[in-house]
Amino acid sequence: MSADYTEKLVTSRTGYEGKLLTLKEDEVRLPNGSSATREYVLHQGASMVVPLFEDFSLLFERQYRYPVGNHFLELPAGKVDRGEAPLAAARRELIEETGYVAERWRHLATLYPSVGYSNERVDLFLAQGLKHEGHPGADGEFLECVRIPLDDALGLVAHGEITEAKTIVGIFWADRLRRGLG
């Protein structure tokens, strides 16, 4: 049996509360009895879609990400609204951002991308049987949809041209599925 390294909450302070994030600062008691400060971000969670066509190409979005000041190729994703199921969020994001709907959905994995400073959870969903039904363009989002063959996407990861973490995981999942491992 492994040791219990659970930290116990002593005090908690909210430093900022916004629409998307809450910044917390907690004092905790460590297993050895000393205390420490933990700064972290609360996030209501997100869903990401791995839109996989029959020919094993993927549907990406190219968009500007303000916090890092650069454009990124990403798989469709977005926050889960309060009271919304992760699959419902994935379906909503796919149609809003790309104009596509999917006949078949499957939960692939759950990720915690930054456990050292955030509770953000991202659920990954495979979307297949894709059909274009609408025009993308959620309010306030400016992006370009790009269809890329899986082998090319793997090459973009290998050459450092796709660097967004959850997208890389989604590409690797698509490759596993193609090889019959998922």
PLM features per residue range, with description:
Residues 1-17:
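Extreme N-terminal tail/first-helix region
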Residues 13-48, 54:
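Acidic, metal-coordinating catalytic segment for phosphate/diphosphate chemistry
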Residues 20-27, 60, 124-126, 145-147:
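Conserved hydrophobic/aromatic beta-strand scaffold that supports enzyme active sites
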Residues 23-25, 37, 61, 75, ...:
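Hydrophobic residues on conserved beta-strands that form the core of alpha/beta folds
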Residues 36, 45-48, 53, 79-165:
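Unchanged
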Residues 46-70, 74:
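A glycine-rich, hydrophobic loop/mini-helix early in the fold
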Residues 171:
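C-terminal boundary of histidine-terminating zinc-finger modules
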Residues 176-182:
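Generic C-terminal helix-cap and adjacent flexible tail
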